[in-house]
């Protein structure tokens, strides 16, 4: 998240929700840790409309696994503690 982290993103999302604005979450080339944090944050906001968190696919490898799953173009978090990364 290029806005200052999870806290700043939630603050922006709250302001948008108060004003009836829907959200689109996106990223640049990011690790699975960062994308997992953004996905968890996006899914916690009722005004999230679109999610485009595919930056990991541009990277050749990552230090961790897990974090989320992507099936049929739909991203979802894993049923694991924390961000679900290991």
Task: For each feature predicted by the language model, list its residue ranges.
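Shared catalytic-loop signature of beta/alpha-barrel
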Residues: 1-74
């Amino acid at each position: 998240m290029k806005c200052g982290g999870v806290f700043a993103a939630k603050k922006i999302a709250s302001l948008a929700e108060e004003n009836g604005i829907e959200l689109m979450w996106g990223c640049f080339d990011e690790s699975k840790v960062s994308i997992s944090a953004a996905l968890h944050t996006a899914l916690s906001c009722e005004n999230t409309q679109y999610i485009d968190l595919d930056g990991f696919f541009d990277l050749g490898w990552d230090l961790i696994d897990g974090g989320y799953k992507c099936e049929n173009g739909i991203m979802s978090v894993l049923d694991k503690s924390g961000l679900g990364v290991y």
